[in-house]
């Protein structure tokens, strides 16, 4: 990743409306108006693994979708709207109309790569086709989702 992309990734992540305990984005490795690619490594010690299939822990599907939404929709919108360049703006996202297929489980400590392609962005709604792959490149989840958002002053 280039120094410019590294700095842009940092700026985008800082504008995401999530605290450290609920941010599922480690890095944005590519972004333009139509596409975004990022990654996240699920922590081995995350508390949900103790209760989600305790004898064979897997990452809950709702958290996979959250990761996909944070990278593929919210971070992409921060880029498209150039929110990363603006001061005193807070983004309030609302995920809706999600269609998802879960294809492979994601385990503890696994790094996932999320790639989203914009289908359209109009009237404050971003619709994207989003893929979540494991570090071997295997497709684990495929989703199409909409994101609506409101900007608030901080």
Stretches found by the model and what they are:
Residues 2-5, 35, 105-154:
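HotDog/MaoC-like acyl-thioester-processing domains
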Residues 2-4, 73-115, 140-144:
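Hydrophobic beta-strand-centered segment that forms part of the acyl-chain substrate-binding groove
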Residues 7-9, 40, 57, 67, ...:
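RNA-interacting cores
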Residues 16, 42, 58, 100, ...:
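Hydrophobic beta-strand core residues of beta-sandwich domains
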Residues 20-59:
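Catalytic strand-loop segment that frames the active site of acyl-thioester-processing enzymes
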Residues 53-60, 64-74:
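Compact, glycine-rich, soluble single-domain proteins
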């Amino acid at each position: 990743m280039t120094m410019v992309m590294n700095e842009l990734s940092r700026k985008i992540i800082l504008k995401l409306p999530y605290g450290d305990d609920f941010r599922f984005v480690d890095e944005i490795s590519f972004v333009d108006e139509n596409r975004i690619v990022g990654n996240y490594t699920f922590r081995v010690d995350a508390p949900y693994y103790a209760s989600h299939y305790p004898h064979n822990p897997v990452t809950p599907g709702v958290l996979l979708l959250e990761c996909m939404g944070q990278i593929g929709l919210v971070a992409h919108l921060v880029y498209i709207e150039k929110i990363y360049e603006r001061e005193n703006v807070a983004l309030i996202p609302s995920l809706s109309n999600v269609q998802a297929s879960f294809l492979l489980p994601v385990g503890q400590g696994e790094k996932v790569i999320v790639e989203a392609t914009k289908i359209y962005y109009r009237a404050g709604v971003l619709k994207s086709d989003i893929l979540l792959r494991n570090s071997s490149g295997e497709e684990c989840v495929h989703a199409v989702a909409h994101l609506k958002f409101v900007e608030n002053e901080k």
